């Protein structure tokens, strides 16, 4: 059964690519779909200018600019990117709004999150989280439930800036994840835009946690912690 993850906002293509690679190594069939108006996710994937109404292979995962007719039967997980355009016609099992904490004004992104929050849908609530030290030490007993959609705030010192952001915009901490990024994240992000081999061993532990959380949610009851650690390490090396 296909699980649909909807992503709004920006600055998330590296998160989607890394997570898709890990899930592929776990034996899942994954498709990345860019339904944004400016096709910004497409720019992170080489050699696909003008791709329309077809599915191509990228690093063992599928990529398309629209939802294939056979998606429900052909894939386990779909990461669907919509940019800044809210699409109430698509039901997502999980919904995310991603923003950069270094934006001059976060108000437009918070307003987008509020629009998504107002949509009438019934997402799954249970998500699994890794320990704070990253994917090397996964605690199977650590889990939490939150209300969707999830607001993801990324950037340098995002965790320390979160309290100010929450105070300014009345953001509910239960549905928000603040994730610190550093120079290693930026290097890997630039690399995945231009290199055909995507490696991400230099990313921050907070970002590894975010990948782990997304992957565990997609895997659900099928996850195997030992195999997941191997799949994560393999994906980090670009395999």
What is each residue range found by the language model?
Residues 189-239:
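NTP-binding/hydrolysis catalytic cores, primarily Walker-type P-loop NTPases
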Residues 2-14, 28-91, 107-110, 160-166, ...:
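P-loop/Walker-type NTP enzyme "switch/lid" segment
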Residues 67-68, 112-116, 206-214:
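Generic hydrophobic alpha-helical segments
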Residues 10, 100-103, 205:
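Short, surface-exposed acidic/glycine-rich loop or hinge patches that mediate macromolecular interfaces
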Residues 19-28:
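A short, Lys/Arg-enriched amphipathic alpha-helix followed by its capping loop at the start of a domain
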Residues 80-192, 198-199:
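Conserved catalytic-core segment of NTP-binding enzymes
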């Amino acid at each position: 059964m296909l699980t649909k993850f909807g992503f709004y906002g920006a600055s998330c293509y590296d998160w989607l690519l890394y997570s898709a690679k890990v899930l592929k190594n776990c034996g899942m069939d994954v498709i990345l779909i860019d339904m944004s108006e400016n096709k910004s996710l497409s720019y992170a994937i080489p050699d696909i200018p003008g791709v329309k109404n077809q599915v191509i292979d990228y690093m063992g995962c599928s990529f398309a600019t629209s939802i294939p007719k056979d998606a429900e039967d052909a894939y386990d997980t779909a990461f669907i990117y919509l940019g800044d355009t809210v699409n109430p016609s698509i039901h997502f099992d999980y919904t995310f709004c991603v923003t950069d904490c270094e934006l001059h004004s976060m108000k437009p992104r918070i307003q987008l999150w509020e629009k998504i929050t107002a949509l009438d849908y019934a997402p799954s609530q249970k998500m699994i989280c890794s320990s704070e030290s990253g994917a090397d030490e996964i605690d199977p007993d650590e889990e939490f439930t939150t209300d969707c959609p999830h607001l993801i705030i990324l950037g340098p010192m995002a965790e320390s800036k979160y309290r100010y952001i929450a105070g300014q915009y009345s953001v509910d901490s239960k549905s928000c994840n603040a994730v610190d990024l550093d120079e290693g994240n930026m290097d890997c992000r630039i690399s995945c835009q231009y290199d055909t081999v995507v490696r991400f061993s230099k990313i921050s532990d907070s970002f590894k946690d975010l990948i782990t959380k997304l992957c565990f949610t997609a895997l659900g009851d099928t996850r195997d912690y030992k195999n997941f650690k191997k799949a994560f390490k393999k994906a980090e090396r670009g395999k």
